[in-house]
């Protein structure tokens, strides 16, 4: 019996450390063998689950969050794997390694080492199942794009533009079925696919891991969709025991990858065969088997999941009204990520043909209302290689403008952009919209602003009080705006054209009540930075 660490005994902070062990091959190791390890440093213990990787190889993965010496010891019901022990010296983090993303300042994000993380996502559901040539093209595209996260599926996807079969499957294939899209994703049983759900295909997961690591190398988080309804193979209709075993296997393999997020579902409410109790169980299994505390969410189609669930870290939402981020962040007390706001493109489906201008506006609407927004692209160029499904190249107009917005955000406050509560937009939203406005309340000065000279501030604005204010005027096209910064403070004033990607200094020094004049056009923003 031998054991080896694939890192040759070396390890570094926030990098996956792996132990590879040789064990039994008889019977069904996926069912029969239990393996875990305890990593210790002083009084601390971190328990990790092992998994079978095929061909008699068992693996344990650990994500060190502290430098120095760690010891490890295995526990298993297989004698050959039980009671093994060793140690590893964890060195300093390698360049670019910051650890998993966490929630910070209630509504924002940061890496585990405190480095700021700005959530700017895109969606390419099964880019990782398209063969090496297209997958490598997608990675090259992402390396030049502004996105810091990609939403992607663990399982393959059945839908229009997704009739090709993957090279591998997550479970042992018993009988191949049909692949043609017939206009409906319902009824996976009619396609004739059969799998042995008691036997995983390790090569499928190794390929997924390869792509996740390649995303990490270019600074992109993998927001992994664990379940989804778009299915011709039966993966959305496994039994509860099969679902649970899949979750445990997946978390054992991937929890030690620093750039993984758990998205329990894409459109959980389109899987009526799974009950609220099922989703609660899935959340708990995933969180219980992730000792490294990755972000976790549940994405909707129609009805929101209850984002107040204590183990949900952020609200992953499908809605076009990104401006509602201001309401949802207060409702849930968590970061809001509008992970589907429709797609820039030209396909027939209603959600897949908004303009680049609309996509950019939704990004800005989300940001100035304290949220984050995810991009998607669905251009019909006569092929079925569409970014939203398969990746490849990005051809839309929104991407460079999202990059422009990202730069503005990066240059903004380290704490993140929070809605400014004195604006008309904020106060109307907090009263439940125009239908619910109580006029007297609308004009009562917010706490702390009593006695301030009047200054109309209707536009949604985000920033940090007394330091930084970013207002977005959307499709409106005023020719002037009143400066509504706090009294007795001076600010620089910059006009931002979010579509033309320009910044024009309007004044080096303004104060409350000053009036700024500029050429009227839509999609403008005003940025005020304190100078005194």
Give a label for each model feature:
Residues 1-44, 48-51, 87-93, 451-461:
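Non-catalytic, glycine-rich low-complexity segments
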Residues 5, 11, 28-29, 346, ...:
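Aromatic- and carboxylate-lined catalytic core of secreted/periplasmic carbohydrate-active enzymes
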Residues 293, 309-387, 393-397:
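Catalytic-core region of carbohydrate-active enzymes that cleave or remodel glycosidic bonds
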């Amino acid at each position: 019996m031998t054991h080896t660490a694939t890192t040759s005994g070396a390890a570094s902070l926030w990098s996956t450390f792996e132990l590879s062990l040789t064990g039994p091959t008889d019977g069904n190791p996926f069912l029969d063998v239990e393996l875990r390890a305890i990593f210790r440093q002083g009084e601390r213990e971190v328990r990790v689950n092992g998994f079978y990787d095929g061909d008699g190889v068992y693996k344990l993965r650990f994500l060190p969050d502290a430098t120095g010496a760690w010891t490890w010891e295995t526990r298993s019901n297989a004698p050959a794997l039980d009671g093994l022990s060793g140690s590893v010296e964890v060195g300093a983090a390698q360049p670019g390694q910051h650890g998993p993303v966490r929630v910070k300042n209630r509504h924002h994000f940061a890496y585990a080492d405190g480095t700021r993380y700005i959530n700017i996502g895109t969606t390419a559901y099964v880019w990782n199942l398209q063969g090496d040539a297209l997958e490598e093209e997608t990675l090259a595209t992402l390396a030049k794009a502004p996105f810091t996260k990609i939403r992607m599926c663990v399982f393959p996807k059945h839908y229009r533009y997704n009739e090709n079969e993957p090279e591998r499957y997550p479970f042992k294939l018993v009988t191949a079925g049909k692949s043609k899209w017939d206009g409906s994703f319902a009824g996976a049983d009619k396609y004739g696919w059969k799998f042995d759900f008691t036997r995983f295909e390790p090569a499928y997961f190794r390929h997924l891991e390869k792509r996740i690591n390649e995303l990490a190398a270019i600074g992109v988080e993998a927001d992994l969709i664990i379940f989804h309804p778009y299915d011709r193979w039966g993966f959305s209709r496994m039994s509860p025991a099969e679902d649970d075993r899949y979750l445990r296997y997946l978390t054992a393999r991937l929890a030690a990858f620093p750039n993984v997020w758990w998205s329990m579902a894409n459109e959980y409410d389109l899987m009526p065969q799974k009950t609220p109790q099922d989703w609660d169980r899935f959340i708990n299994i995933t969180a219980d088997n992730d000792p490294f505390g990755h972000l976790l969410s549940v994405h909707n189609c129609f009805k929101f999941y209850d984002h107040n669930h204590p183990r949900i870290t952020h609200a992953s939402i499908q809605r076009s009204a990104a401006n509602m981020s201001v309401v949802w962040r207060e409702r849930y007390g968590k970061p809001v990520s509008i992970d589907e706001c429709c797609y820039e493109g030209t396909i027939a489906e209603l959600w897949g043909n908004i303009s680049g201008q609309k996509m950019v506006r939704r990004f800005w609407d989300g940001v100035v209302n304290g949220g984050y927004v995810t991009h998607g692209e669905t251009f019909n160029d006569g092929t079925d290689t569409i970014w939203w499904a398969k990746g490849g190249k990005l051809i839309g107009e929104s991407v460079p403008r999202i990059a422009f917005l990202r730069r503005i955000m990066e240059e903004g406050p380290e704490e993140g952009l929070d809605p400014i509560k004195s604006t008309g937009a904020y106060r109307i939203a907090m009263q439940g919209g125009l239908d619910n406005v109580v006029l007297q309340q609308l004009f009562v000065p917010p706490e702390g602003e009593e006695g301030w000279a009047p200054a109309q501030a209707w536009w949604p604005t985000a920033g940090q009080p007394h330091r930084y204010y970013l207002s977005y005027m959307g499709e409106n096209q005023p020719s002037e705006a009143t400066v509504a910064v706090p009294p007795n403070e001076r600010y620089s004033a910059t006009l931002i054209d979010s579509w033309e990607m320009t910044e024009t200094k309007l004044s080096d020094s303004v104060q409350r009540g000053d009036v700024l004049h500029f050429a009227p056009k839509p999609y403008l923003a005003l940025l005020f930075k304190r100078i005194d």
